[in-house]
Amino acid sequence: MSHLTPRRRTLAGVVALGAAVSLTAACSGAPAPSTGSTSAKTSGFTVDTPAPTKDAGDVVWATYRETQTLDPIQGFDYPEQTADSILCESLLRQKNDMSYGDGLGKLTQPSDTEFDFEINANATFWDGSPVTAADAVFSLKRAADPKGGGFYSGVFDRVKSIEATGEKTLKITLNEPDYWLLGELSSTPGEIVQQKYAEAKGKDFGTVTGGTMCSGPFKLDSWQTGKGVKMVPNPTYWDTTLPKPKLTSITLIGVPDDATFTAGVKTGAIDGGYVIALSTLGQLSTDSNVKVYQGAPFLAAAMVISATKGPLADPKVRQAVSLALDRKGIINTVFRGAGNVPHALQASGTWGTAVDTFSSAYDALPAMDQDLAKAQADAKALNIAGQTVTIGTSSGIPSLNSEALAFKAACEAIGLKVELQNVSPSNYINYFIDPKAWGSVDAFATSNYGDYADPSSLYKSMAAKGGSQNFSGWVNPDVEASLNAARGEKDDTKRAQDVIAAQKIITDQLVWFPMVAANNVLIMNNKVTGAPATFVYMFGPWAAYLGGA
């Protein structure tokens, strides 16, 4: 049985985004549910915002920094995926409710190790040429090539072959069943680009110089460093089941701080954005010219445990720290109430299938409430007083730094000594890509996410043997067996049960430290409406629903 090798994603922005800027991430909207409840939140969240009634004209949309590439295989962070998801299309399509189905391709499955796709007969690239099976095979093989410099080759590790079987048909043959692959094919790894264009542009493909060629509901109009990525509706878009965008253009711009974003939305210079831990959320929530939507948590706000020795390498110590951690304080001060005390690392926004099964299992896990007296008693029995742990942080990334400081306080409350390793925002990425960096600390904060709505999409990367984010080398045979079983299971409920079995152990052992089940927040001014309030903006045609209010 092959081991679980997740996508190779360096998380540059999953980290930077989480704090230095709060302009990124969302999943569904509505008033924030109470932070005092301990049951899973599956209601009270918005999927769709009110549909537009008129043309919005030119729309300006904020991401936390400028877009650096439009090459899907290089798109591993919020600015890139927010743009690629409306320019390019995956073989399968993620819907606003985070489920997925047929997209650019129609799926049939002759056996557990064969996925057949038929490209829609009407699908064309922006230049009018048809999307062919050859384009799809080229794109998937390019994403699967570990030498291609992309971030997703690992998700294809059970693929035996990808080949065109006709002008519009292709077959993916597997070495063994892999139902995670379908989720990936509805996401960035499954996005199809035009072979002729990509080959002609070579190393310039996906850059400001070379641009891109896709089939999505928007096409690239212009891209200038410092001025953003301007996209316009594709006038010959093939899929009539999607609404036609009610806008003239949408420009994604980089907005690196809360104050600039807040002022922009209030004055109309910025029309909207998806945000994380926005310090001015309360202010905007009461502004009559602004609409704030909160939704089911998709991303994981967590402390990565990278310790291989010392106190935090011991799950009993981690459990004591968890009991000492004031998560409600973090929710109120860092997330401004837009979250809940977690039961596990992955909460309701990640339940794309078998919702009742996942919900019941989540509720069965205890809420991670603070119990300082028990934490201190447990720590005393472990005889750890005076031992030292090192936490990686960056004071230049405010929300991640605040989470790191809260974690520090919890460690100190049970008698541990804490040293902070403070690095620049630009160097924080090294904790995710450099073994020397993550090996120099015992823990560091992250805002992390999978590629589709299933908890396994993240668990496979951080708790499986060989996982790209398994920085401590943690291995558990039962987790390995459960995740492997889930990967090969066709039935949604049975697959969920396998993931839940792994989740129970991952949660009990605190392989990573869940900090907050952070609601996904969408902010728009009164000029625009229609953007889905879910995390689909990273993977599906979200801006097709956008227009004038």
Task: Describe each PLM feature range.
Residues 340-381, 398-400:
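Structural transition elements
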Residues 52, 419-422, 426-427, 457-526, ...:
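Extracytoplasmic/peripheral linker and loop segments enriched in polar/acidic and small residues
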Residues 236-283, 417:
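Ligand-site clamp/hinge motif
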Residues 60-111, 141, 213:
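N-terminal lobe/hinge region of extracytoplasmic solute-binding protein
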